[in-house]
Curated annotation (Swiss-Prot):
Record region (NMP): 30-59
UniProt-annotated binding residues for Zn(2+): 124, 127, 144, 147
Positions contributing to ATP binding: 10-15, 121, 130-131
PANTHER family: NUCLEOTIDE KINASE
A GO BP annotation: AMP salvage
Quaternary assembly: Monomer.
GO cellular component: cytoplasm
Gene (name only): adk
Alphabetized UniProt keyword annotations: ATP-binding, Cytoplasm, Kinase, Metal-binding, Nucleotide biosynthesis, Nucleotide-binding, Transferase, Zinc
Reactions this protein catalyses: AMP + ATP = 2 ADP
Domain note: Consists of three domains, a large central CORE domain and two small peripheral domains, NMPbind and LID, which undergo movements during catalysis. The LID domain closes over the site of phosphoryl transfer upon ATP binding. Assembling and dissambling the active center during each catalytic cycle provides an effective means to prevent ATP hydrolysis. Some bacteria have evolved a zinc-coordinating structure that stabilizes the LID domain.
Keyword hit for ATP-binding: yes
Name the UniProt record assigns to this protein: Adenylate kinase
Length: 215
């Protein structure tokens, strides 16, 4: 199975990716991980890639496509999830030239829920445990339950940054939903309630692909 995961920041892509890896044996491929590995291992195009990232610039589609192809070539014999790897129509067009995806899974969440998930997120400065002040708050405000260290809010989770991320998402990524819909590859799942999301995924995989959990 080759699966593209779509959805706005905070929609639950990381959560559902972990679930699919553990319960269905899929390999998780994300742009962030691929970029970090390319730079750390000094892989093909690493210097050009590092020059963009170190300046805080968006990596151009052409360079992203080259690096993504290199990663995909190593995993073509496996079932995998592409998480955040396809962000523009140009990238989707390129992907279609090297493989035929089975499913584009779109995680739908209302904007106000996304905002609460992201702005409410806090991370332990030591153990990196993740909390949310709205949904899973620590017992003591701003203090980690496990080690007593202070909780921090990532810069990316501040409202001003989130508003900008959502603007970029709507401009570049929302057209992908229509793109895969026209190809009859798109399946939308409401992920507002994360507790129901796993069951919805299980039902989809059984009904559409006759796949059951390996665990």
């Amino acid at each position: 199975m080759k699966l593209v995961l779509l959805g706005a920041p905070g929609c639950g892509k990381g959560t559902i990716s972990d679930y699919l890896v553990k319960n269905y044996g899929l390999v998780h491929l994300s742009t962030g991980d691929i970029f970090r590995q390319t730079i750390d291992q000094k892989g093909p195009y690493w210097e050009e890639l590092k020059s963009y990232i170190s300046k805080g610039l968006l990596v151009p589609d052409e360079l992203t496509n080259k690096i993504l192809k290199n990663a995909l070539d190593k995993n073509m014999d496996k079932s995998f999830i592409l998480d955040g790897c396809i962000r523009t129509i140009a990238q989707a067009d390129f992907l279609s030239t090297i493989l035929d995806i089975d499913l584009a899974l779109y995680l739908e969440v209302p904007f106000d829920v996304l905002e609460k998930r992201l702005t409410g997120r806090r991370i332990c400065s030591k153990c990196k445990r993740i909390y949310n002040i709205h949904y899973s708050a620590p017992k003591k405000e701003d203090i980690c339950d496990d080690d007593g260290e202070f909780l921090i809010q990532r810069k990316d989770d501040q409202k001003e940054i989130i508003d900008e991320r959502m603007k970029v998402y709507r401009t570049n990524s929302e057209p992908l939903i229509k793109y895969y819909e026209k190809l009859n590859k798109l399946v939308a799942i409401n992920s507002e309630n994360l507790d129901d999301l796993e069951k919805n995924i299980d039902d989809l995989f059984i009904n559409k692909f006759n796949l059951r959990k390996i665990a």
